[in-house]
Amino acid sequence: MSKLSQPATTPGVNGISVIHTQAHASGLQQVPQLVPAGPGGGGKAVPPSKQSKKSSPMDRNSDEYRQRRERNNMAVKKSRLKSKQKAQDTLQRVNQLKEENERLEAKIKLLTKELSVLKDLFLEHAHSLADNVQPISTETTATNSDNPGQ
């Protein structure tokens, strides 16, 4: 059985160190690990492919730079238009909801008045029925029960 050797640390860029280890005797290959170089972890570990793009500044007169700027400007313009449209849609929805709220409040007032009128009619009718009903006395009931045929 073979043992792994001690990992070798290579100083990297952007505060990142790359740890290399030797492969097993079986021929398995290990992938280098990206770790922060400092004890504070001074940044995110970035793969080398991403690091190379950041390290070389682009010439402002190059075609690639102009194309990137143009694409970025178009994206910003599109984003701002989308944001404006969303704000307009929201404002329109707010106005629709306000109008609907006013209609509903008017309907509530109308229905409340109608309920009040109906309650008054009901109470008036109930009182008139109560006034028309004569109290039944015990004498009348006794007389009617003695003469069931009449």
Swiss-Prot record:
Q: Where is the bZIP domain?
A: 62-125
- Under the GO molecular function aspect, what terms does this record hold? DNA binding; DNA-binding transcription factor binding; RNA polymerase II cis-regulatory region sequence-specific DNA binding; sequence-specific DNA binding
Report, as the record phrases it, the tissue specificity of this protein. Answer: Ubiquitous.
Q: Which SMART domains match?
A: BRLZ
Q: Where is this cross-link: Glycyl lysine isopeptide (Lys-Gly) (interchain with G-Cter in SUMO2)?
A: K3
Q: Name a biological process GO annotation.
A: positive regulation of type II interferon production
Its main localization is nucleus
Which region ranges are annotated with the description Basic motif? 66-93
Q: Which domain of life is it from?
A: Eukaryota
Give the start-end ranges of region Leucine-zipper: 97-118
Q: Where is this region: Disordered?
A: 27-94, 129-150
Where does it reside?
Nucleus
Q: Where is the composition biased (Basic and acidic residues)?
A: 56-72
Q: Which GO terms describe its cellular component?
A: nucleoplasm; nucleus; RNA polymerase II transcription regulator complex
User: Which keywords does UniProt give here?
Assistant: Activator, DNA-binding, Isopeptide bond, Nucleus, Transcription, Transcription regulation, Ubl conjugation
Biased composition regions of type Polar residues, renumbered to the chain: 134-150
Q: Ranges of Low complexity compositional bias?
A: 28-37
Subunit (UniProt): Binds DNA as a dimer and can form stable heterodimers with CEBPA. Can form stable heterodimers with CEBPB. Interacts with ZNF638; this interaction increases transcriptional activation.
The entry's family comment says:
Belongs to the bZIP family. C/EBP subfamily.
Explain the purpose of this protein.
Transcription factor that binds to the promoter and the enhancer regions of target genes. Binds to the promoter and the enhancer of the immunoglobulin heavy chain. Binds to GPE1, a cis-acting element in the G-CSF gene promoter. Binds to the enhancer element PRE-I (positive regulatory element-I) of the IL-4 gene. Binds to the promoter and the enhancer of the alpha-1-fetoprotein gene.
**Protein name, per record:** CCAAT/enhancer-binding protein gamma
